[in-house]
């Protein structure tokens, strides 16, 4: 980076995307400061590495900064942003800073409505297994790293590309991955055509020598692959129309086995089996994510045997089918799923992994706008649950809308799920009584799955701690 820039300040530094970039810059030797409204583990980790971070936002916080980095969640009237502009200090969007880091390496950017974080982690693991030591900026905590970031000495930077506000268009990766493309973040895009155009623009930015790795199972992404006439493209998926295919998928508990077939229709070569993979994650969606990572690894000539070993030892990502507690009495899982497609995939994986056990879903809806946009699908995505307990909607800064959802909250969703599911569905008790309520619903051998992108993970860990300490979980 230009030598005049030495001190970089992050507004909202505790966010998962911001903290990863901040950690990379710290490791590269920059002075990093930041602010956030609340404390969390990301902030503690950055402080331990030398960042100066204050709680709350004040104009004085940017003192000495050469640049101020913001996420899309930071408003224009934030006192630190206003102070920076008054002092003519550059205010840099998070994605622009990530793009600057990508200029120093060959970029591998993983985009998609779902599966970005897991796929990013898998790509990093496969490159690491080949001693390529990539730099990593992820949207979740990789368990093997204990962080969402890593500064490697290799030639590649692997990152999650966030499409939520269109800022992934600032990136210029060498390899672009698209896992899927569903209607989401419509408050930003307005129409699904705008979403399609954004993903088209993202993939189009790869150079002529680059590669687009696209999920051929998803109809929208498959159409995108057909449009990329002047780009190198590899498709992957479970269907027999793709270049890299998974077959003979078998799930035992949370372990999945499958065979990988490579097709080469463009050059007339015969299809061949590459071998069998053992993956310590359940679900066809994770098989698909793994195929994407394998496609990237094969492009970079990672030996197959190293891929097999790396995947067998892959420890996963926090809050992605995160097994918090397992014993004969109960199994407790924490998962980030908050979109109907994600919830359906997670619940199917749970049902396949625990076919003889009762499945209890504890769901915290995230944002009024998302519930309104996807109400039809939210009411139908819990078909693999026996019990569904719905928490109040996590606002994430949104105000209640006019109409039944704003007036009655999550009870509207409870009633909708009841109409379209055979599960027992109820509203979870308030903060003071939720543990008592949940504990009273459980039976021996139940599988409890906490779902959501808000603060539901805190409850999941609290509830699991109660069981692990052999205390009464109804009191947590």
From Swiss-Prot:
Pathway(s) per entry: Cell wall biogenesis; peptidoglycan biosynthesis
Catalysed reactions, semicolon-separated: UDP-N-acetyl-alpha-D-muramate + L-alanine + ATP = UDP-N-acetyl-alpha-D-muramoyl-L-alanine + ADP + phosphate + H(+)
Alphabetical keyword list: ATP-binding, Cell cycle, Cell division, Cell shape, Cell wall biogenesis/degradation, Cytoplasm, Ligase, Nucleotide-binding, Peptidoglycan synthesis
Enzyme Commission number(s) of this protein: 6.3.2.8
Biological processes per GO annotation: cell division; cell wall organization; peptidoglycan biosynthetic process; regulation of cell shape
Alphabetized GO MF terms: ATP binding; UDP-N-acetylmuramate-L-alanine ligase activity
Highest taxon above the source species: Bacteria
Annotated Pfam families: Mur_ligase, Mur_ligase_C, Mur_ligase_M
Entry GO CC: cytoplasm
Family: Belongs to the MurCDEF family.
Name of the molecule in the record: UDP-N-acetylmuramate--L-alanine ligase
Gene source species: Magnetococcus marinus (strain ATCC BAA-1437 / JCM 17883 / MC-1)
Recorded name of the encoding gene: murC
């Amino acid at each position: 980076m230009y030598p005049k820039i030495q001190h970089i300040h992050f507004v909202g530094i505790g966010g998962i995307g911001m903290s990863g970039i901040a950690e990379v810059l710290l490791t590269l030797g920059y002075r990093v400061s930041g602010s956030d409204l609340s404390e969390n583990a990301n902030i503690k980790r950055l402080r331990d590495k030398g960042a100066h971070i204050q709680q709350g936002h004040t104009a004085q916080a940017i003192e000495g900064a050469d640049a101020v980095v913001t996420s899309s969640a930071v408003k224009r009237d934030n006192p630190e942003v206003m102070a920076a502009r008054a002092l003519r200090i550059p205010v840099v969007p998070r994605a622009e800073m990530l793009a600057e880091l990508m200029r120093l390496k060959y970029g591998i950017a993983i985009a998609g409505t779902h599966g970005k974080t897991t796929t990013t982690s898998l790509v990093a693991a496969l490159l690491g297994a080949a001693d390529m030591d990539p730099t990593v900026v992820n949207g979740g905590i990789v368990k093997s790293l204990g962080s969402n970031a890593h500064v490697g000495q290799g030639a590649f930077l692997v990152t999650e590309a966030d499409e939520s506000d269109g800022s992934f268009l600032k990136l210029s990766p060498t390899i672009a991955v698209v896992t899927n493309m569903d209607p989401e973040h419509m408050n930003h895009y307005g129409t699904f055509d705008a979403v399609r155009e954004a993903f088209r623009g993202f993939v189009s930015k790869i150079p002529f020598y680059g590669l687009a790795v696209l999920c051929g199972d998803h109809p929208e992404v498959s159409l995108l692959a057909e449009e990329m006439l002047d780009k190198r493209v590899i498709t992957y998926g479970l269907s027999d129309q793709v270049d890299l295919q998974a077959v003979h998928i078998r799930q035992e508990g949370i372990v999945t086995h499958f065979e990988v077939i490579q097709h080469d229709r463009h050059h007339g070569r015969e299809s061949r089996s590459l071998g069998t993979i053992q993956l310590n994650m359940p679900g066809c969606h994770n098989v698909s994510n793994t195929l994407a990572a394998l496609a990237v690894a094969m492009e970079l000539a990672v030996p197959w045997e190293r891929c097999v070993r790396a995947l067998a030892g892959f420890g996963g990502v926090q809050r992605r089918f995160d097994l918090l507690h397992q014993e004969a009495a109960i199994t407790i899982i924490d998962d980030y799923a908050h979109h109907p497609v994600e919830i359906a995939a997670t619940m199917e994986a749970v049902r396949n992994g625990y076919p003889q056990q009762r499945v209890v879903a504890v769901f915290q809806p995230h944002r009024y706008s998302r519930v309104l946009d996807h109400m039809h699908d939210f009411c139908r995505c819990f078909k693999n649950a026996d019990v569904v307990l719905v928490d109040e909607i996590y606002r994430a800064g949104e105000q209640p809308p006019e109409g039944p959802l704003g007036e009655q909250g999550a009870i509207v969703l409870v009633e909708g799920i009841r109409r379209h599911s055979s599960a027992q569905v109820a509203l979870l008790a308030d903060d003071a009584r939720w543990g008592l309520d949940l504990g009273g619903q459980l039976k021996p051998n139940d599988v409890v799955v906490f779902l959501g992108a808000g603060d539901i993970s805190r409850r999941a860990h609290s509830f699991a701690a109660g069981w692990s300490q052999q205390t009464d979980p109804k009191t947590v």
